[in-house]
Design a protein with these regions (language model features):
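Residue-level detector of Asp-centered blade-edge/turn motifs that repeat once per structural unit
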Residues: 32-35, 76-79, 123-126, 170-173
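A short helix->beta-strand "capping" segment at the edge of beta-propeller domains
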Residues: 2-23
Length: 185
């Protein structure tokens, strides 16, 4: 019997490669829907979300230069709405699964609720969005409507401080973990 996957030299299972029959320029992030894979690309031919199904069929693109300039991270909710952090425009862009713009929130600034080069994002257990507010050296939590719920962190290297936080995730207990880029932690 042939397994539907292979094993990479690193020891991790390798299941399949999607998207090789088309140009995928500078993939940045990936999200999964019920039947589709969403690949966020930027630069070159990118700045869009490519949609591919599990049969490796190209289902087109969503977003593009009219909605975001320098996309970094992608989230997909249960309704397959797409959330993209746009580093250059300092905002979060929300589209439906067909690519129609629902709303955006965020503007450049250092006050709580404003963003300066947002990067990583994750949903919490309630469906709110936790965002790495990279240049402001903090983490912010918003509703999907863009209402600020929480803001924490400051510039520095002490406990509770960040220097260019980039990635963010949350565990089942609600603890938030941050990849603190310039502090190398």
């Amino acid at each position: 019997m042939v397994a539907p996957f292979d094993l990479l030299r690193s020891g991790f299972p390798y299941y399949m490669t999607l998207g090789q029959r088309r140009v995928t320029s500078n993939p940045m992030d990936i999200g999964f829907g019920k039947e589709n894979v969403y690949v966020l690309t930027r630069g070159g031919l990118g700045n869009e979300v490519r949609v591919i199904n599990w049969d490796d069929e190209n289902l087109g693109t969503r977003g593009g230069a009219s909605l975001f300039q320098w996309p970094v991270a992608l989230l997909v909710d249960d309704e397959e709405n797409l959330y993209v952090s746009d580093e250059a425009n300092h905002k979060i862009v929300i589209m439906d699964k067909e690519g129609e713009h629902i709303r955006s929130f965020g503007e450049q600034g250092s006050e709580p609720g404003k963003l300066d080069r947002p990067s990583g994002m994750v949903f919490d257990a309630e469906g709110n969005i936790i965002v790495s507010d990279t240049v402001n050296n903090r983490i912010q939590r918003f509703t999907t409507e863009g209402e600020l719920l929480q803001c924490f962190g400051e510039s520095g290297s002490d406990e509770g401080a960040f220097s260019m936080p980039w990635g963010v995730t949350v565990d089942q207990s609600g603890n938030i973990y941050v990849a603190d880029w310039k502090n190398d932690r």
